[in-house]
Amino acid sequence: MKAVGVIVEYNPFHNGHFHHLNETRQKTDADCLIAVMSGNFLQRGEPAIVSKWARAKMALAAGVDVVIELPYAFAVQAAEQFAHGAVQLLAAIGCQELCFGSESGEISAFLSAAKTWLEQKETFDSLIRTGLARGQSFPKAAAEAWQKFGAAPLDLSKPNNVLGFAYVKAIWQNKLAMMPRTIPRLAAGYHDESFSHPSIASATSLRKTLRQTGRLESIAAYVPPATLEQLRQYRETYGRFHDWEVYFPLLKYRLLTATEADLRRIAGVEEGIEHRLKQHIAHAETFAAFIAAVKTKRYTWTRLQRLCAHVLTNFTKEEQAKAANPTYIRLLGMSEAGRRYLKQVKKSAALPLVARASKLNGDSLYEQEKRAAAVYAAAFPEPLYSAALKEEYATAPIYVSGIERK
């Protein structure tokens, strides 16, 4: 069976994601589509709108055959480390190709950019560091660095391109036998906050609309029925969706009771940012107001969100340094085709394939995952808190037969 990988967050799964899956299967002739998916906290440092289990069900209903989890130590990171963990997991489970969305859908631009970067890595990275030190954003610093080598083959101001570039670099750096492919994204931009197309919208705009209206009907045109049903069930069970504001009291407690020395141990706390965190936390009444007060050119909103997630989960620089590579493949769900594929590769997979969380106790990556799960569940009062926490430890991989797919 030919396995093809996708790297996803599905926050939530929408029609653009559905298009990506269909195009991926069609262009690659995949027998098995494998999604490596961030868990309860995401690459930009946000809590996922619903749990990884609810999002895995959305993915399986839409045609994904296997869903595996990207551990927190790689999921809540800048593009390079995020990509490093994700492509290694897909390679370990036997994916022959990786297919990602991009602005142009032309893989040649990514290959050309990666080749130039590999040949000029030291110079390129030095130029980026210089730009960042001057207070530039990463896209701006990268664009200026490319100009030193002639015209940039990629527009690195676009998030999909930044991630795609990181995926190709990670495949080459790790010498993985996995071919990268790309397809053009549809209509809505990654961060678009409004609806500009009758059926395609960004996950950002969907979450914003849900926050503003509270009505699932307001996003019905932009998501498959299975997504709507999972969102409905989740809110019915737990009473709410997740966003940063619900965690702000917990973050405030952590920052007010931590010393600056404590904060300097946390991953992402550099260049004296701990002073600004302590300076502004007492007076901020919302998470959004707090980040707006703390952010600088160097410390962007996204970077601060990741840092705050690390503060909540107590993810330290020492733990980050030790998290060099994934150590296991955690299975979240599978279709019948996925079950057959996993049976075929179980003995040949490069990492242990784990279905039960209890088997991972003691693994340093999973110990961090447990802390993230404890924080994520803190959005709810008891007895819902304990129920959500139990889901992390007791849930077996989801199985979806062909009949159940919508």
Curated annotation (Swiss-Prot):
An example of a Pfam family matching this protein is HIGH_NTase1
Task: Please indicate which superkingdom the organism of origin belongs to.
Answer: Bacteria
Q: What is its EC number?
A: 6.3.4.-
Q: Where along the chain is ATP bound?
A: 7-20, 101, 160, 185
Which cysteines bridge via disulfide bonds?
A: none
Keyword list, A-Z: ATP-binding, Cytoplasm, Ligase, Nucleotide-binding, RNA-binding, tRNA processing, tRNA-binding
User: What InterPro entries does its record include?
Assistant: Rossmann-like_a/b/a_fold, tRNA(Met)_cyd_acetate_ligase
Subcellular location per UniProt equals: Cytoplasm
What residue range is the signal peptide? none
Query: Which enzyme class?
Result: ligase
Q: Does the keyword Ribosomal protein apply?
A: no
One Gene Ontology term from the biological process aspect of the record: tRNA modification
| Reaction catalysis annotation | cytidine(34) in elongator tRNA(Met) + acetate + ATP = N(4)-acetylcytidine(34) in elongator tRNA(Met) + AMP + diphosphate
One cellular component term from this protein's GO annotations in UniProt: cytoplasm
Q: Per its UniProt record, what Gene3D superfamilies does this chain match? A: HUPs
A molecular function (GO) term: ligase activity, forming carbon-nitrogen bonds
- Membership in a protein family: Belongs to the TmcAL family.
User: Briefly, what is this protein's role?
Assistant: Catalyzes the formation of N(4)-acetylcytidine (ac(4)C) at the wobble position of elongator tRNA(Met), using acetate and ATP as substrates. First activates an acetate ion to form acetyladenylate (Ac-AMP) and then transfers the acetyl group to tRNA to form ac(4)C34.
Name the HAMAP family on file. Answer: TmcAL
Instruction: Spell out the protein name for this chain.
Output: tRNA(Met) cytidine acetate ligase
Organism listed in the record = Geobacillus kaustophilus (strain HTA426)
